[in-house]
């Protein structure tokens, strides 16, 4: 019986430490996968890379990073749902971004300037690398 009462605090401590360890590294794993996918996409020479997209980074100054990532996800979804190229990579990227982005946002295309898919992916890669360096 005495052994059990001594083990409980140790087990609780181990559980707390491991859960912190796992949650602390989730950011790294997700960001690594996003960066790898972005590296693959930006290295490709594909006509889809010149498709027009809303410039989600030309948002007002008070826009949060989560809103910007949400808008990027919306644009990626719009591309891979309406074009057959790069679907696997763009959907994977969208899925990974959704974990870092806010759940609701809007892209008002009438007021938003346009860019290309390649520019969107390059800027997203820069942001993700900066975020990874701080993780």
Curated annotation (Swiss-Prot):
Q: What is its main location?
A: secreted
Could you list this entry's UniProt keywords, alphabetically sorted.
B-cell activation, Cytokine, Disulfide bond, Glycoprotein, Growth factor, Secreted, Signal
Instruction: Give GO MF terms, alphabetically.
Output: cytokine activity; growth factor activity; interleukin-4 receptor binding
Compartments where located: Secreted
Looking up SUPFAM superfamilies in the UniProt record yields: 4-helical cytokines
Protein name as annotated: Interleukin-4
Role summary: Participates in at least several B-cell activation processes as well as of other cell types. It is a costimulator of DNA-synthesis. It induces the expression of class II MHC molecules on resting B-cells. It enhances both secretion and cell surface expression of IgE and IgG1. It also regulates the expression of the low affinity Fc receptor for IgE (CD23) on both lymphocytes and monocytes. Positively regulates IL31RA expression in macrophages. Stimulates autophagy in dendritic cells by interfering with mTORC1 signaling and through the induction of RUFY4.
- Tell me which family the UniProt entry assigns to this protein: Belongs to the IL-4/IL-13 family.
This entry carries the following GO cellular component terms, namely: extracellular space
Would you list which residues are glycosylated? 62, 96
Q: Which domain of life is it from?
A: Eukaryota
Q: Which residues form the signal peptide?
A: 1-24
Disulfide pattern: 27-135, 48-85, 70-105
Q: Name one GO biological process term.
A: interleukin-4-mediated signaling pathway
State the InterPro entries in the record.
4_helix_cytokine-like_core (IPR009079), IL-4 (IPR002354), IL-4/IL-13 (IPR001325), IL-4/IL-13_CS (IPR018096)
